[in-house]
């Protein structure tokens, strides 16, 4: 019975992963066509935590390979000199940058990292339709796009970029 259960679980997981991949690709193509509209970013402080006086904050956007525009908060240490190590931060599925991932990013910036906390595709201020879809494939691509974006930032040491999420 134990072997049958493990086989059933493995088959179900494989089916879900395959179906998720196909759905992600299809949804990504649909989103790419719909992403021509601009994001409606808020520029006032909208987090559940106070802004640190040790960092500068600004909103940035970047696009993943599916054409979905991602919204992010960038935190830069005020005492920054030279090229900085960088970290891209995002929370679990359904979380937004105004919550814990933003707090982690800001705290890491206080410690000398240039950071971004971004909303994954289909979530928060980022683009993508339908809304509130969770796709492991696209989430992975979002992190790749975040690393690519950070590597183009003038203040970032492209050899020292990490992710957290």
Put a short name on every predicted segment.
Residues 99, 122-134:
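Glycine-rich "HGGG/HGxG" loop immediately N-terminal to the catalytic nucleophile
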Residues 36-82:
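N-terminal cap/lid segment of alpha/beta-hydrolase-fold proteins
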Residues 107-125:
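Conserved alpha/beta-hydrolase
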Residues 83-92:
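Short beta-strand element of the alpha/beta-hydrolase
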Residues 94-106, 120:
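The serine-hydrolase catalytic nucleophile loop
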Residues 133-154:
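Alpha/beta-hydrolase active-site loop
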Residues 155-165:
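Alpha/beta-hydrolase fold nucleophile elbow
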